[in-house]
Amino acid sequence: VLGTAAPRKVQFMAKAELFVPVLGTIYRLLGAFPVRRGGNDKAAIKHGIDLLKSEGVLAIFPEGTRSRTGELGKAAPGALMMASKALAPIVPACVVGTDVFRVGKIWPKVSVRFGKPIYFPKDEPITKEVLKNMTDEMMARIAELQAGVKNGN
């Protein structure tokens, strides 16, 4: 859903288990590439960093998974790691309404919103504290976007 609303081609990391015959081809056509979860998938991480360094767009879900309730969860500790290695801007985004697909509605309303970019500091090292502050800022902006959608804005 996010990729169809973005003004540029978006690529995604998706769990390797989804890349079975036929379905895997569809995911690749939609811009996804596999990542082995629960470990350090160096090839997938390198692919993501290289994509960002070449000014491509990589969408990640900072919580590490989808929300079944529609509520915003806590960001995973490494949510900004690839962007920090590439010094790529972070564009907060939210998708609201996909949690109702399972309820049985035929055409649920889904909204996608993009926020203003967050940039890594140019004149200071990217420390754990900088990453934590940027992650907190990103999650706060996503929460604002989500609240705006839920309030009809």
Residue ranges of each PLM-predicted region?
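Non-catalytic C-terminal accessory region of glycerolipid acyltransferases
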Residues: 43-153
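Catalytic core of membrane glycerolipid acyltransferases/transacylases, capturing the structured
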Residues: 1-39, 46-47
